[in-house]
Amino acid sequence: MTPFVVEFLGTLLLVSGGVFGGPLLAVAALAIAIAFGGKVSGGHFNPAVTFFHYMKGDLSQTKTLWYLAAQYCAGLLVYFIYKL
């Protein structure tokens, strides 16, 4: 899988865990996401972490924008599922 798909799925797990299950499930979902996708994408799964790595110089501007787009799309998808 590409890093962007991994970021999308990891963020989807993290936000879904927080919205539908609470903090403990969110932490468990984050641990699962990092275990399965951390080596592919770096395991950011959070726009703040991605922005930090961009400011630190670890990510290019293009890669940062793609990561952020994947993370925001995952968050929006959880929002729309929640509103159903």
Feature locations, PLM:
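Membrane-interface helix-loop junctions and terminal tails of multi-pass membrane proteins
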Residues: 1-84
